[in-house]
């Protein structure tokens, strides 16, 4: 059975992608549905003053994993080469590069200490083809982001496209890992569930229509910060973000992605509670 030793608790780490701190009920947002994130906040600790090492995906993730700032670990921007992307998109002809080679991640330490480590979801720190940093279970997204349906994935058999909604699939794989741990001896586990949600795309065809339509038709989005200056690349590429309908469409997909991610967090919490492991699992 997974660990019931209170000195060696199990660990579940959920990482979302591009989620604003205002997008939860526990943060005062009355329009979005996040009962499970609110449930965690009510029984745990919610930081109100928190700083990220980088506003960009790959360096921020590398900092979380290594405890180092970008100038120390060397990843300064989102990775477009040397990753599985280079091999998946044949025209790039790039080699696979493990950008954090030679650096210790906290999952390395956990694995060395006897933890069984599993990762389901987004990696985006180089060479997604091969398990790294102490992980023995490895079912990850090929790229740094992409479609919610037919998402490119990699497992032990190579790359494939997943037809189902990818947020659900990440959780399916996470529960597969947990089930295997529940059948093992008293070994603590670490599970990383790295959702691509709520990163774009946000169009209706990328998400379950019923939820997208509910937000599009019913939500005033008054809880969403407005009037912020768009990122430089948004202005440079001329991406429309200021007209009312474009804003409503984007936010409908954004809120949908968060609500459905929250529902999947609930699936993991429910599994832990059903197995009697919730009290001995850091979440």
Annotated model-derived regions:
Residues 13-14, 20-118, 137, 143:
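Active-site segment of extracytoplasmic enzymes that catalyze sulfate/phosphate-ester chemistry
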Residues 3-9, 16-32, 142-282:
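Active-site-proximal cap/lid insertion segments
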Residues 52, 62, 129-133, 149-151, ...:
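Short aromatic-enriched loop/helix-cap "lid" or pocket-rim segments at secondary-structure transitions
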Residues 47, 71-73, 129, 198-204:
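Secretory-pathway/luminal and periplasmic proteins that interact with or process carbohydrate-rich
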Residues 123-126:
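Short, polar loop motifs at secondary-structure junctions
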Residues 133-134, 175:
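Short, structured coil segments at secondary-structure junctions
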Residues 4-8, 33, 39-42, 56-58, ...:
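Extracellular/periplasmic catalytic domains that process cell-envelope and extracellular macromolecules
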